[in-house]
């Protein structure tokens, strides 16, 4: 669609494709949120309710790429100055983490020491969904411009704890 508008109206419309986003102000509803906000909420509520375990779907092995929401904002500003092509561009961080690694990081950040119980009867999802951000890097975006998953999770968890229970999807 952006290509058609670009051609028809002569405007610099581009298509920037992120991967899995997370960060403050996300949707933390357990029924329809994405994996990271759901895990943050599950772990926090298990901690404050002194529950001995957190139940997670699947076996934790699928690998996913995640990008902190503030990084996407910076990348979009970068693209406004550096990209004027009709073809889509992938803009997400391509570091892969297993769901198990993510849950363990969230537990560590939140100080939850209960047990993780994997519900292997539930779907784990596709094992990998890799993307390539090489075009973005070729434009001059630096890999160091991405917030590490651990740092982004820390910021998101701290925000969630500070705002709980008045966060989207909880209150």
Residue ranges and their predicted role:
Residues 1-19, 38-49:
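Active-site Tyr-X1-5-Lys
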Residues 45-171:
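C-terminal substrate-binding subdomain of Rossmann-fold SDR/epimerase-dehydratase oxidoreductases
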């Amino acid at each position: 669609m952006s290509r058609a508008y670009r051609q028809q109206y002569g405007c610099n419309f581009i298509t920037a494709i992120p991967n899995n986003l997370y960060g403050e102000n996300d949707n933390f509803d357990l029924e329809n949120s994405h994996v990271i906000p759901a895990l943050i909420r599950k772990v926090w509520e298990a901690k404050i309710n002194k529950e001995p375990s957190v139940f997670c779907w699947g076996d934790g092995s699928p690998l996913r790429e995640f990008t902190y929401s503030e990084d996407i904002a910076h990348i979009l500003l970068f693209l406004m100055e550096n990209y004027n092509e009709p073809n889509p561009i992938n803009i997400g961080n391509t570091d892969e983490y297993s769901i198990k690694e993510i849950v363990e990081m969230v537990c560590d950040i939140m100080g939850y020491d209960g047990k993780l119980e994997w519900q292997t009867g539930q779907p784990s999802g596709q094992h990998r969904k890799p993307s390539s951000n090489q075009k973005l890097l070729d434009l001059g975006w630096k890999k160091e411009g991405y917030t590490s998953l651990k740092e982004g999770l820390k910021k998101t968890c701290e925000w969630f704890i500070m705002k709980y229970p008045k966060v989207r999807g909880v209150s």
